[in-house]
Amino acid sequence: MFYPAIRKVLFQFDAETIHELTIKGLKSTGKSPFNAFYKQTVQDKPLTVMGINFPNPVGLAAGLDKNGECINAFDAMGFGFVEVGTVTPRPQPGNDKPRIFRLPEANAVINRMGFNNKGVDYLVSQVQAANFKGILGINIGKNKDTPEENAKDDYLHCMRKVYDLATYITVNISSPNTPGLRSLQYGDALNELLAALKAEQTILTEKYGKYIPLAVKIAPDLTGDEVKSIAKSLIDNGIDGVIATNTTLSREGVEGLQFGTEQGGLSGQPVKEKSTLVIKLLSEALNNKLPIIGVGGIASSDDANEKLEAGASLVQVYTGFIYQGPPLVKEIVNGL
């Protein structure tokens, strides 16, 4: 695979421009013979998590394919599952540009995208058109202009729209780029949101005749006590899984680098240890009552194994994939 040579050219251009061009290219080739440029076969490493049979434990994290436009293309690369979104009830432009910055010296990215997406109805149309038969996670969030006290209405709206199309649904309450979102991770706000989603899950299970698991995505910037409190809420409300973690607000590991002081969430190598620690603490607090999907700084099979040893059952990649491309998927799957 010739990704390193391609990356050299791509990295000469603005990060978001290249992202948009890549999405267009993958969308147009996902089900065509041209997917031979990135299609690859990986080893079967089947496992069952949240009652779902995964062909392998390596998934694409949310954020790369926000609108569900390239599902078949990512599947062709060997991912065991693909998570699309974050999607909101209404389309929104996100934050002002520039809003994504590469920090290659640290194998990192800082983004402050702000849930830019074309809205849940558009995502639904794309998922239907893809006719994808693999494992699809759909990550849902709230619109920026929705007051915090009404946040659960946004999550419920998205949940109802995507329920029949998703293999699992992720509730994103941990992006640092939507004001007030992370406050939903704590105490009564979290319990009220989870209780409402769980009640809706029961109604939708009856309506569609199938149970779609709910996972919650949390931040890496949590104390040990906060992790324990979140774990208790997840268990008490019967949530099916947890994704750990989102991007960090810390700038440890990028001090002095170009763009290192830009606002937004930091992902990639610098978040690896923070994420792994949260997974370890979560695993201890959850006591095998629900599974963890580990994400944050995975750039090799060793990194992935570190997450699994800390207590994760599955892993996801994003920033490592930007830097290494499809070969990373094969390297991780075959190296587990």
UniProtKB/Swiss-Prot annotation:
Q: How does it sit in the membrane?
A: Peripheral membrane protein
Biochemical pathway = Pyrimidine metabolism; UMP biosynthesis via de novo pathway; orotate from (S)-dihydroorotate (quinone route): step 1/1
A cellular component term, taken from the record's GO annotations: plasma membrane
The GO molecular function terms of this record are: dihydroorotate dehydrogenase (quinone) activity
Q: Where in the cell is it found?
A: Cell membrane
Group of enzyme by EC: oxidoreductase
The active-site annotation reads: 175
Q: How does it assemble?
A: Monomer.
Which GO BP terms, alphabetically?
Answer: 'de novo' pyrimidine nucleobase biosynthetic process; 'de novo' UMP biosynthetic process
| Function description | Catalyzes the conversion of dihydroorotate to orotate with quinone as electron acceptor.
Detail the disulphide connectivity of this chain as listed in its UniProt entry.
Answer: none
PROSITE patterns the record matches = DHODEHASE_1, DHODEHASE_2
Q: Name the chain's protein.
A: Dihydroorotate dehydrogenase (quinone)
Q: Which family does it belong to?
A: Belongs to the dihydroorotate dehydrogenase family. Type 2 subfamily.
Reactions catalysed according to its record: (S)-dihydroorotate + a quinone = orotate + a quinol
**Keywords recorded for this protein, A-Z:** Cell membrane, Flavoprotein, FMN, Membrane, Oxidoreductase, Pyrimidine biosynthesis
The cross-references to Gene3D superfamilies, in alphabetical order and at most eight, read: Aldolase class I
What residues does substrate bind to?
A: 66, 111-115, 172, 177, 246-247
Residues annotated to bind FMN: 62-66, 86, 139, 172, 217, 245, 268, 297, 318-319
Which gene name does the record give?
pyrD
